[in-house]
Swiss-Prot record, chain A:
Similarity comment: Belongs to the Wnt family.
UniProt-listed PROSITE patterns: WNT1 (PS00246)
Protein name: Protein wingless
Functional summary from the UniProt entry: Binds as a ligand to a family of frizzled seven-transmembrane receptors and acts through a cascade of genes on the nucleus. Segment polarity protein. May be a growth factor. Acts on neighboring cells to regulate at least one gene, the homeobox segmentation gene engrailed. Wg signal represses arm phosphorylation. Wg signaling operates by inactivating the sgg repression of engrailed autoactivation. Wg and Wnt2 have a role in the developing trachea and together are responsible for all dorsal trunk formation. Wg also acts in the developing epidermis.
Location(s), subcellular: Secreted; Synapse; Membrane; Secreted, Extracellular space, Extracellular matrix
Cited PANTHER family: PROTO-ONCOGENE WNT-1, WNT RELATED
Keywords: Developmental protein, Disulfide bond, Extracellular matrix, Glycoprotein, Lipoprotein, Membrane, Morphogen, Secreted, Segmentation polarity protein, Signal, Synapse, Wnt signaling pathway
UniProt effect for mutating T416A: Glycosylation disrupted
Taxon lineage: Eukaryota, Metazoa, Ecdysozoa, Arthropoda, Hexapoda
Keyword field contains Lipoprotein: yes
Disulfide bonds, paired cysteine numbers: C93-C104, C146-C154, C156-C185, C233-C247, C235-C242, C397-C428, C413-C423, C427-C467, C443-C458, C445-C455, C450-C451
């Protein structure tokens, strides 16, 4: 490579990097926690205790934004689902990250503060996961609540039913999903999707990069829920023929969605400020200028806060870059985050509503029309299901309350593992302590019909390793 | 609806029962037989152990309940809704057809039957239109071809045989030519199968006494018969004579309505089990026991068959159409197409096969098995030929589906082996352990018969236990064979190994057991 060329590139990288950083800083100040305060709803109370009137509860009042309060008021029964969803998100997040340095810890919730702590102020991978999983959980639990009938305002959309099931199954019998539309109330995912957009995306206007990142990750979470909505069909008929075919949709267990999102977390795409930041045109191509302007690798070694970034090796270990594998389904069109893209069925009335509400609706849809460019121009642009982040994650090794990092002191680790949960990585090389403890646990359980489990209490010795 | 048809064995099984031997040897042989169900029990117990482990964390039962609830919510409602949308118009059309026929027949003099046939034809046509849409034209074309073939009957008995061969052959040809190209053939196949059965039966019936007795039915009668609303969409087969008998409804509407209701309820129940409950259970036991997975998957297949059968029963009841043959008519449900209770808890494989699809069984017995086996005292070779012939015809009727061929041949061999062995055992032990239920206290020829013995006698319990073991074995075979038929019969042929996966997992156990049965039989006799 030509030296002068490299020089120019570095110069440009510095310029744009600097400017992007300053912008990130700026919006952290202005947009801090804007759309994320609602997470606190998880701690408001037990889902069971919530009655429809409780949207007036002061705790909820302080947690939700005005528009969110209105949504909750207008959709009786939704509050319980939201609380459930938020708790679902937290427990799933903590499950997925149980073996990592950052273990999705939540803080004691107090009003005006963010549930997941200050880590959310940074646009790092972990933040992207938080946004995606919370949005996904809300979609999931609302859809589930819909099908359970606990939300009064989500009616079954009978416009989706085929005129007669018979008319479909012939064509669908082999071609599969092609032109089959589900019937009944099983398409509540549409309501969940719509509601999640209205509710979760409230504070995110998409005006700056961080808000775009949040929007993108929220959308990605919803897209994962939608993708896990499986159609199942069964043929009935004489001699294995397909005279009667019945189909239904099934929403997968949230654990599956959590697993998928975690995989996307591992292969998340780092995005950067582009020249077309304010372009609302969905079809704006990746500008060659912007793409070429920054050739710094995505492992972020050149970022100024070097004290906090991972070492190269650890970074690889922790983040397992594999955008190429995970982007296999991002065909060219899916670069555009058209809201209806993942499944045209899900938002049947988008067109109608758009027509009815005119301009307002149009503006709202534009919110999702943007293109994020990968930090490393050699990577593919993020697809609709990919998570995106802006800056490298801190190492999470040392306690840093200013940044909301608890550190890994006192965490348990696995001595034999070579992965992130192994003591070497988990304790950041500080060393670890070996303790023998006597654990009392239930054992030799027997099942008595029906339905009782009787167990003995056993004392076993266990060795645990704790980071210093 | 119908993977059965070897029931015919039953006919000759009871014909010759001689050969008395001593009881000594049989004790050992019984042990062997008991050994098999035990191996199956191992599966069972294995499964229960696993279940306990699942339960250990205290969530097993809850989890199962949760999953069931979940699948119920997402699956039952749409399934039932779609089934209702499917069945309701058909039922209404059947009732309409019945009403029209009733009104017409109440005229003073019945000048012509043609309007009755026309009502049937029109209603059937509307049902088919609702079911298959424009593909109806293809069916009508095939019906026209069938009518042309029917003219062969002018040749007499020989013509009927040619007709049968041509019909079955052409069905196979359609499969070969159309199936590959058309994605919708699987839907038409079942309908066309019933039409073919009706054609063949018509041919044999008309030429029964060697000469052409009656005129070949006119086009209206033919079309009315072929596309009668009660039987056109879902079957079952009814003979032309039976159709003519029921042109004018006899039962009162009240009786029909009373029978319709339980049919509809059971229909919904069956589709729920087939779509939702069985797959959920199969999922739940997915990691613990392969036998349970097979069992639940096969239950899904079986209840799918019950579902179609009961739906067809509802249509029969609605249009007051009766079935041929031994009057298997229950007071509650009307004509019976299958007897789920005999399938879920079978006495033997052959009795199971006979209860699977009664009209189809009747058809095969009447038109294929009986002609192939002219006299009762025929040689064993002749009988075997008749069985093979029956197998071949029913396979061909079912169309090109490798899975069905495999299942049918396995069923035939298993049923044959079991019947032979049990007959031998019965005569050896002088106990009522044959494949067929003993006819009762007076007529049972064996001395050790549960109906003759008191509860506290040892032989009573031994006979009971033996039959129970055979039942358990049949249940295992049923799960083993049924699981293959799960899923669409569409992608067969491309990946032959995928549907044999379960058999591989089970180590082809059923087939070895079947083989063992034959060996044991030869050993004893």
């Amino acid at each position: 490579m030509d030296i002068s060329y490299i020089f120019v590139i570095c110069l440009m990288a510095l310029c744009s990097g600097g400017s992007s950083l300053s912008q990130v800083e700026g919006k952290q100040k202005s947009g801090r926690g804007r759309g994320s305060m609602w997470w606190g709803i998880a701690k408001v109370g037990e889902p069971n205790n919530i009655t429809p009137i409780m949207y007036m509860d002061p705790a909820i009042h302080s947690t939700l934004r005005r528009k969110q309060r209105r949504l909750v008021r207008d959709n009786p029964g939704v509050l319980g689902a939201l609380v459930k969803g938020a708790n679902l998100a937290i427990s799933e997040c903590q499950h997925q990250f149980r073996n990592r340095r950052w273990n999705c810890s939540t803080r004691n919730f107090s009003r005006g503060k963010n549930l997941f702590g200050k880590i959310v102020d940074r646009g790092c991978r972990e933040t992207s996961f938080i946004y995606a999983i919370t949005s996904a959980a809300v979609t999931h639990s609302i859809a589930r609540a819909c099908s359970e009938g606990t939300i009064e305002s989500c009616t079954c959309d009978y416009s989706h039913q085929s005129r007669s099931p018979q008319a479909n199954h012939q064509a669908g019998s082999v071609a599969g999903v092609r032109d089959w539309e589900w019937g009944g109330c099983s398409d509540n995912i549409g309501f969940g999707f719509k509601f999640s957009r209205e509710f979760v995306d409230t504070g995110e206007r998409g005006r700056n990069l961080r808000e775009k990142m949040n929007l993108h990750n929220n959308e990605a979470g919803r897209a994962h829920v939608q993708a896990e909505m499986r159609q199942e069909c069964k043929c009935h008929g004489m001699s294995g023929s397909c005279t009667v075919k019945t189909c239904w949709m099934r929403l997968a267990n949230f654990r599956v969605i959590g697993d998928n999102l975690k995989a996307r977390f591992d292969g998340a795409t780092r995005v950067q400020v582009t020249n077309s930041l304010r372009a609302t045109n969905a079809l704006a191509p990746v500008s060659p200028n912007a793409a070429g302007s920054n050739s710094v690798g995505s492992n972020g070694l050149i970022i100024p806060q070097s004290g906090l970034v991972y070492g190269e090796e650890e970074e690889r270990m922790l983040n397992d870059h594999m955008p190429d594998i995970l982007l296999e389904n991002s065909h060219p069109i899916s670069k555009i985050h058209h809201p209806n893209m993942p499944s045209p069925n899900s938002l049947p009335q988008a067109g109608q509503r758009g027509g009815r509400n005119g301009r307002r609706q149009g503006r709202k849809h534009n919110r999702y029309h943007f293109q994020l460019n990968p930090h490393n121009p050699e990577h593919k642009p993020p697809g609709s299901k990919d998570l995106v982040y802006l800056e490298p994650s801190p190492s999470f090794c040392e306690k840093n309350l200013r940044q909301g990092i608890l550190g890994t002191h006192g965490r348990q680790c696995n001595e034999t593992s070579l992965g992130v949960d192994g003591c070497g990585l988990m304790c950041c090389g500080r060393g670890y302590r070996r303790d023998e403890v006597v654990v009392v646990e239930r054992c030799a359980c027997t099942f008595h019909w029906c339905c009782e489990v009787k167990c003995k209490l056993c004392r076993t010795k266990k060795v645990i390793y704790t980071c210093l | 609806m119908d993977y059965q048809y070897f029931e015919e064995e039953s006919d000759y099984i009871d014909l010759d029962e001689e050969e008395e031997d001593d009881d000594v040897e049989t004790a050992g042989s019984l042990d062997h037989r008991f050994g098999q169900p035990n191996s199956e029990d191992d599966y069972y117990f294995g499964g229960e152990d696993e279940m306990e482990e699942l339960v250990v964390d205290g969530h097993g039962v809850l989890e199962l309940a949760g999953r069931l609830l979940e699948s119920m919510q997402s699956c039952v409602q749409p399934s039932v809704l779609q089934v209702m949308q499917y069945v309701a118009p058909m039922l209404l059309l059947c009732l309409l057809c019945r009403l029209l026929c009733l009104l017409y027949s109440q005229r003073r003099r019945l000048t012509s039957l043609a309007p009755l046939h026309l009502f049937h034809f029109a209603c059937g046509l509307i049902i088919l239109q609702l079911t298959v849409g424009y593909r109806l034209l293809l069916l009508l074309l095939l019906a026209a071809v069938g009518y042309l073939l029917l003219q062969l009957l002018r040749l007499g008995r020989r013509g009927a045989q040619v007709l049968a061969v041509l019909t079955v052959g052409s069905q196979f040809l359609y499969e070969l030519l159309i199936w590959r190209r058309r994605s919708d053939w699987p839907q038409l196949r079942g309908i066309q199968m019933v039409v073919n059965m009706k054609l063949i039966s018509l041919g044999f019936d008309l030429t029964a006494s060697g000469q052409l007795q009656a005129r070949i039915p006119g086009p209206f009668a033919y079309l009315g018969y072929i596309y009668s609303p009660a039987t056109c969409a879902l079957g079952p087969w009814v003979s032309f004579g039976c159709y003519m008998d029921c042109l004018v409804p006899r039962n009162s509407c009240l009786v029909s309505l009373r029978r319709l209701l339980p049919n509809v309820v059971f229909c919904v129940l069956a589709v729920t089990v087939s779509n939702c409950l069985a797959p959920a259970l199969s999922d739940f036991f997915g990691d613990s026991s392969h036998f349970l997975v097979m069992y639940w998957d096969a239950l899904s297949v079986r209840s799918s068959h019950y579902f179609v059968g009961i739906m067809a029963q509802a249509l029969l009841v609605a249009s007051d159409q009766r079935l041929d043959g031994a009057t298997k008519e229950s007071d509650m449900l009307g004509p019976l197409i299958s007897q789920p209770w005999r399938i879920e808890w079978p006495r033997s494989i052959s009795s199971l096969v006979r209860s699977w699809n009664i009209p189809m069984h009747e058809w095969l017995k009447r038109y294929i098995y009986a002609p192939c086996k002219p006299t009762a005292s025929s040689s064993r070779g002749r009988t075997l030929l008749a069985v093979l012939c029956t197998y071949l015809v029913s396979s061909l009727l079912h169309g090109m589906d490798l899975r069905i061929y495999l299942v049918l041949i396995s069923l035939a061999l298993l049923a044959e082996g079991e019947s032979l062995l049990r007959r031998q055992l019965a005569s050896l032990l002088n106990a009522c352990v044959t494949a067929n239920l003993c006819p009762g206290k007076e007529r049972c020829r064996y001395s050790h018969c549960p109906s003759k013995r008191r509860l506290n006698s040892l032989s009573y319990w031994l006979v009971r236990l033996t039959n129970l073991a055979f039942t358990a074995l049949a249940i295992f075979h049923l799960a083993y064979l049924g699981v293959v038929l799960l899923g669409d019969g569409l992608e067969v042929g491309e990946d032959g190994d995928s549907f044999l996966w379960h058999w591989q997992q089970a180590g082809y156990l059923s087939h070895y057991i079947g083989l063992g049965t034959f060996v044991l039989y030869l050993f004893i006799s």
